[in-house]
């Protein structure tokens, strides 16, 4: 997979799942089990991409994915820090694509106190990053095991 394709795939999938999982994030009913399933599916996709790219030992994918989700983490943290300022709207628009795909986990954290709601926002872009990194390293480990098996085949 070429770099431009990987970047477009990351952006496209994130926007699709953000659109599918928007219910309750801005307005409307709180997230339900459907939103949770969408979020889990989103994590599974990112894990799978990470695994495949790790098996290929494609370090550029790791760099792109880490940068992509790193920007999401930074945007979300800035939203939390500057939430009382008038520039909040533009910051939320920047972090929205990174938060919305994980909105389904709000189904599990509906009853958090107000102070913990900020933590609820911050973990949303962190989970896909961790899932991608775990997938990548599991794929890389599988690739190394496969190569070791080839050495011992007669």
Regions inferred by a protein language model and the residue ranges of each:
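Transmembrane alpha-helical segments in integral membrane proteins
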Residues: 45-49, 121-145
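Juxtamembrane non-transmembrane "cap" segments at the membrane-aqueous interface
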Residues: 81-104
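Juxtamembrane "helix-exit" motif on the non-cytosolic side of transmembrane helices
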Residues: 18-29, 52-53, 76-86, 108-110
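Transmembrane alpha-helical insertion/packing segments
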Residues: 1-45
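Transmembrane alpha-helical segments of multi-pass membrane proteins
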Residues: 8-13, 61-79
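Hydrophobic alpha-helical transmembrane segments
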Residues: 104-130
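Alpha-helical transmembrane segments of polytopic membrane proteins
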Residues: 31-43, 65-66, 75, 91-99, ...
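Canonical alpha-helical transmembrane segments
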Residues: 39-64
């Amino acid at each position: 997979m070429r770099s431009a394709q990987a970047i477009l795939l990351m952006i496209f999938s994130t926007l699709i799942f953000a659109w599918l999982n928007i219910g309750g994030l801005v307005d409307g009913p709180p997230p339900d089990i459907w939103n949770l399933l969408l979020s889990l599916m989103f994590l599974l996709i990112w894990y799978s991409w990470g695994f495949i790219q790790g098996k290929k030992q494609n370090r550029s994918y790791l760099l792109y994915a880490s940068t992509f989700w790193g920007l999401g983490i930074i945007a979300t943290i800035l939203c939390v820090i500057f939430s009382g300022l008038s520039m909040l709207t533009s910051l939320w628009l920047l972090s929205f694509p990174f938060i919305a795909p994980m909105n389904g986990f709000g189904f599990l954290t509906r009853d958090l106190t107000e102070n913990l709601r900020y933590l609820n926002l911050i973990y949303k872009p962190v989970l896909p990053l961790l899932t991608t990194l775990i997938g990548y390293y599991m794929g890389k480990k599988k690739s190394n095991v496969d190569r070791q098996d080839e050495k011992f085949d007669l």
